[in-house]
């Protein structure tokens, strides 16, 4: 009986950790922002994904042991990440907490970034996780970034960014931003969508 209770408590704790928390787009605009690295694509897609699916909802997680975590993407693919890979992503993604930002949201964004690097490493046969992070920060394009989160079944690629996008990204040749309801993220500030952002992605459940 005692063993059963211990197992039950463990299962409940794991389920609690996976509780999906919805986040309003207005919160995401200001919660965290791009730092010194070239993370605009990652910042944009993580905000859009969290807006649609919530914290703990972008992919499923299963903790295997203290050093291994298995994630299952929306497309059904599974990846196993090491604890040190999450730590490496945390160090590499130089995002900053915005004014009145929620650290929990930013931590989940970094976790999404780690998963993106792992997927990119696999899809592009990149030798090391560290190199995959570098390529994610210095060569990722908004038009294809959804593959790195396994969201190809949850996206519409648009030639023009309409004002009615609930959550997505928009781009120019040099920059990518999170967009929602006619507004865009300008380094942690909510501003009206600039017409210079000519293309985009719409994320959907």
Regions found by a protein language model. Give the residues of each.
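Predominantly the structural core of cysteine protease catalytic domains
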Residues: 33, 38, 77-185, 197-204
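Bacterial Sec-dependent N-terminal signal peptides
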Residues: 1-18
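Residues in flexible loops and secondary-structure boundaries
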Residues: 9-12, 48, 79, 89
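Acidic helix-start/capping segments at beta-turn-to-alpha-helix junctions
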Residues: 62-76
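Flexible propeptides and autoinhibitory/regulatory segments associated with cysteine proteases
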Residues: 16-65, 162-172, 179-205
């Amino acid at each position: 009986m005692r063993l059963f209770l211990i197992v039950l408590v463990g299962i409940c704790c794991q389920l609690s950790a996976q509780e999906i928390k919805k986040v309003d787009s207005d919160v995401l605009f200001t919660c965290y922002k791009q730092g010194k690295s070239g993370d605009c694509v990652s910042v944009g897609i993580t905000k859009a994904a969290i807006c649609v699916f919530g914290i703990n909802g972008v992919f499923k997680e299963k903790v295997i042991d203290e050093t291994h975590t298995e994630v299952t993407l929306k497309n059904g693919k599974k990846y196993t990440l090491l604890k040190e890979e999450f730590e490496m992503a945390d160090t590499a993604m130089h995002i900053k907490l915005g004014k009145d930002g929620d650290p929990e949201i930013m931590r989940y964004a970094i976790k999404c970034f780690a998963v993106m690097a792992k997927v990119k490493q696999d899809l592009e046969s990149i030798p090391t996780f560290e190199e995959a992070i570098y390529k994610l920060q210095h060569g990722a394009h908004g038009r294809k970034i959804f593959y790195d989160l396994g969201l190809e079944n949850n996206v519409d690629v648009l030639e023009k960014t309409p004002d009615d996008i609930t959550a997505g990204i928009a781009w120019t040749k040099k920059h990518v931003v999170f967009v929602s309801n006619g507004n865009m993220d300008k380094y942690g500030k909510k501003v009206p969508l600039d017409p210079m952002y000519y293309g985009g992605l719409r994320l959907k459940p």
